Amino acid sequence: MNAQVSFLDGTYTLIHIPLNLYSTLLQPILRVLLPQSQSQGNLRDSPEYELQGLTSDGQHGFLNISITPLECSVVCHSSWAQNVFEPVLKTLPRDVAKSVSVSKDSYMILSVISAGLDAGGRVMELTSPLALAGIPIFFITTYYSDFILVPTKERDNVAKSLLAKGFELCENESNYVTQGYKKGATQPPVTPPHEGLPSNVSEMQKNTFGLLKKRHVTPHIEEGLVLVQCSGREASQLASFNHQRPSISRHTTGNGRRPSWADNVDTKLYTCIISALVSQPRFMSVTLAQDDPPSLLLDKNLLDVFGDSLVGDTEGCLIPIFLNLESLSLEATGIVCGVAGILVQDPQIAESSELSYLSTAQAGAVILSDEQSVRAMGILEPLLTKEP
């Protein structure tokens, strides 16, 4: 596998919102989605003023908002969690606010750009070294890239694990590159596992399914829910759509003020995203990353809301298999690797180009084609069903 892995700047927070509080917390969700709504009074006019977690043109370094049949989950820069969500939570009755979970530990995000490996193999290649090192992760597959959330406190262990797997440290110490394994090539020695950690992937998978079974985690498919994976348009495509608009300097606009966030985005797409969010969709996951156009995994029934603002295979039919992980702590390890590893042992699933994974705060979803989802349920159900 040819892959480039890099740490994104900043630290991030994971937020779980119960579905019955979604409408209550929709306003802070939209404030995070639309950065210009984060008002700081006159400070906004200061040329040196920049909101944390945003690029120079006002875009999020990373943001994921996911609404599923199990929960609403938000991954945002820690400053946004502190300055936008936490003040709202303090206004709620204590017993209500307690049902919202804001991660105490911060996370780093690894951005992965890879080629030359099937989808299932890619998930395994990226997650297995971290799982074997006892590092808890959250995995988000998007239209263009894979993103892995790891605890900030585990940064050194992440680096060691990647190096041991054959990733090479680039001049920029935040980047790792691997060219895959070559027959006969010497690999860095792997440190023996710490006490209590699995020594190989098979042992890790056994531990994972033992834990899931003990916590009564069972796979399920939501009847009638079909997803599509799409993207917003590339910047070059947007330029052709908006060729009549004057060029915008990132320092000032024609009226002497700094350009707003809206000057640099596809406002039609964002209007559609807001419309879908306001409707409390059955399923929608939006990922914004600074080097990619917006990526959306959404209920196929929402396509009419978006019109021609999306690109991608809108005729596809992807089925999510949900795992409710609310009984597990955020420190649980090996879930993504364990589940994906079992599935890719099936030859047909292993060859599928459509296997992906979405981690949310308290759940996980394996996403496959319609046919492969049936095979996957046939594999997972016997492993996670307790004998009478």
Each language-model region and where it sits:
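A conserved regulatory-domain signal marking ACT and ACT-like small-molecule sensing domains
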Residues: 1-388
